[in-house]
């Protein structure tokens, strides 16, 4: 696999970009997660960043990437509505893994947003999407720009939802390379990695949560529910960061 030209690929239509990356993705599928990270660091341009929501399995990708690339900027988009357990988990992992945490927030405070727009998350899909644009998408775009990112690592997995089932290891999103080292991992592999390295699930895992985001749009899992139904009232799975 040879080095890739981000500028040249960005000039192609989306379908042509996917085709141009197909051969590389076929080879990346053969590598393990550590090998994918190492390949990306050797062959894709910097600056490098890692994003995390500090959700249920967050410790895996944070540990995996940070041990290979210590001090990599870790981007968190903080909505102001995370669970108290999430904020404590962020502090715990940042200290334990010595993370170079970079927190980005909306330009409007949560209280100001509610005063202007009401509770957007109660206003159907359109309201949720506006909320996500303000609190997730814009802060992430700002983070990528300010950190001069050209290669973005994330911890998505195909098993998590139908919307992620066909994602490749390597893609281009928001004008930068996006690498998903653990995209093909199942829940058992996640558990084994956590056990091997003395890491923990998010604290709410033990209370029946399969996925954790904001307090107002996250539900405990109940028998018969798909994982994606525990977020955004089942109306959508993605918060906007990993779409487009």
UniProtKB/Swiss-Prot annotation:
The lineage of its organism: Bacteria, Pseudomonadati, Pseudomonadota, Gammaproteobacteria, Enterobacterales. This is Phosphoadenosine 5'-phosphosulfate reductase. Pathway: Sulfur metabolism; hydrogen sulfide biosynthesis; sulfite from sulfate: step 3/3. One of its GO terms (biological process) is hydrogen sulfide biosynthetic process. The active site is at 239 (nucleophile). Keywords: Cytoplasm, Oxidoreductase. Changing residue 239 to S: Almost inactive. 4500-fold decrease in Vmax. Can still form dimers. It comes from the Bacteria. Catalyzes the formation of sulfite from phosphoadenosine 5'-phosphosulfate (PAPS) using thioredoxin as an electron donor. GO terms for cellular component: cytoplasm. HAMAP family: CysH. It comes from Escherichia coli (strain K12). The keyword Oxidoreductase applies. It is found in: Cytoplasm. Belongs to the PAPS reductase family. CysH subfamily. Its EC number is 1.8.4.8. Severely inhibited by reagents which covalently modify Cys groups in proteins. The keyword Oxidoreductase applies. The gene is cysH. InterPro entries: PAPS/APS_Rdtase, PAPS_reduct_dom, PAPS_reductase_CysH, Rossmann-like_a/b/a_fold. The open, reduced form of PAPS reductase is able to bind PAPS, whereas the closed oxidized form cannot. A movement between the two monomers of the dimer may allow this switch in conformation to occur. Its main location: cytoplasm. Pfam families: PAPS_reduct. It catalyses: [thioredoxin]-disulfide + sulfite + adenosine 3',5'-bisphosphate + 2 H(+) = [thioredoxin]-dithiol + 3'-phosphoadenylyl sulfate. Homodimer. One of its GO terms (molecular function) is phosphoadenylyl-sulfate reductase (thioredoxin) activity.
